[in-house]
Amino acid sequence: MYIEKIQSPADLKQLDLEALKVVAEETRTAVLNRVSKHGGHVGPNLGFVEATVALHYVFNAPEDKFVFDVSHQCYPHKVLTGRASGFLGDVDDMNAISGYSSPAESPVYDNFEVGHTSTSVSLATGLQKARDIKGTSENIIAIIGDGSLSGGEAFEGLDEASELGTGIIIVVNDNEMSIAENHGGIYKNLRALRESNGECQHNWFKAWGFEYKYLEEGNDLQKLIEVFQSVKDTDKPTVVHIHTEKGHGFQPAIDNKEAWHWGAPFNVEDGSRSSNSANSAESYEELYSNWMLREMKNDPTLIAVTAGTPAAAGFSPDKRKEAGKQHIDMGIAEEQACAMASGMAKGGLRPVWTVYSTFIQRTYDQIAQDLCINSNPAVINVVWGGAGTMNDITHICLFDIPMLCSIPGLIYLAPTTCEEYFAMLRWAIIQDKKPIAIRVPSNGVVHTTETVDTEYSYESRYKVMHKGSEVAIIAAGSFYQKGENVARLLSEQGIDATLINPRYLNAVDAGTLEDLKASHRLVVTLEDGSKDGGFGERIASYYSTSDMKVLVGGIKKDLYDRFDLQQLLSDNRLLDEQIVEDVLKIIR
């Protein structure tokens, strides 16, 4: 097997075309081996195998610099840069290799930690400028998918690359897909370029000042080598537009490109997944999308908004079709999603934008400026917030509470159960005074038989679930059940702790906190996120001039990567027994 012996791209240069074709097939098999056992991005990587072999054959990494956008197509690159063991070995070997471009893993061949989209051209222009200032001559190659071109930073990067005017090569990997189908006017031009074999006179890239090459056969190794050789060492900004097939070489991924963008482990022979990995349990994605579709039938102003990730809202292709004009996806463009939601709310619609926690930071300014300053009553549905969701350094979901709670004019709600979530969602949609964000629970779908409130205040109003004394536990959102566990363990120690569901993350309920002073010595706060700048620190600040002691439970601010959840909780003293130990040390 060639790839077991390849330690660097230089080894490829000793091979003829037929051997390179074997390398490509071995690389595809290795990628399939990894994703079938470990999970990961399937379709994007399979479609970029031949292009990766050709790039490394033609160019001279690490002297020539590759910048992968979003990293969804970087697995073949890893196989060919000395990391094949992470694709051929056992699961432990695979765990040692990140699913994203990572200089921490390979400082020689991976130039940036990348996991969010539309950044490659901008990053590459920085390398371009550094090269020009230093007077060196390496090739700078940015690799970006057509889906990533819907993001505003991609436009900014292309604009700057053209302005710099020196050699940079931008490989547009056009597989006619984002995670789902593409949305945006640019895709009409990409389609026209594909249909005309690159000859369409209305060429978006040429209008921006780029030299332009088109290759229809984007999975043909020989033609890829030829087109890359034709632009090597260029002194002009150049786009190489290649038409690839997402999922190439694996029929299930070809037949259902959206479902196979990313996947849990599967049977590589037929693409089937076990019942466990298929996740037959209830999910908020499914519950939310079904609820929205029912509500849409009675309210034509209700709009489901997504930004390139309709699965985050449970809007499958069939559900998107059913929703029709009442679902809008604007591609991977969170800034546009937020600002457009604000505009829709201003115009009398009821938009609900669903966004992964990790992508909130991509649109902080629009939330603050375009939404909150204008007090437009759009709803932000924040999903997968917390430590138990995504664990790659580029996708940490721990910072949405500090970010959103720092913005004046935004109410951030944290439901603890399914029933409470939908009550909050209905109120947030109906009210017309303020933007409301809701942190969807990330600890599974928990039901309650207790009556939940249907009306909420614009001022923070905590809910005392059990009134005790000495110790008060204020447990927010997904950590409410942890609060229940801690209260139960404390009761075994003879401590009848008060248990509070705060519901509001953005501001303290001064009335409730004042009431606690009479019969409590310690307040424990629990939140599933970064405690630095978070919910608990606001409560600690409130009590800072009093005798009340506050134990803030959350996760220390850091850039964690591929962490084990239980270990992370243990390291931050967030296991139930650890919290009880810390409480007892303080009060006894």
Residue ranges and their predicted role:
Residues 41-164, 302, 307, 316-317:
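Cofactor-binding active-site loop characterized by glycine-rich and histidine/acidic residues
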Residues 64, 250-361, 366-376, 475-477:
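Non-catalytic terminal/interface segments that mediate subunit docking, oligomerization
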Residues 70-75, 144-151, 172-178, 218-219, ...:
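Acidic, glycine-rich active-site loops and adjacent beta-strand->loop/helix elements
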Residues 87-97, 163-177, 372-384:
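A glycine-rich helix N-cap at a beta->alpha junction
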Residues 265-276, 389-391, 411, 530, ...:
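Peripheral docking tails and interdomain loops at the edges
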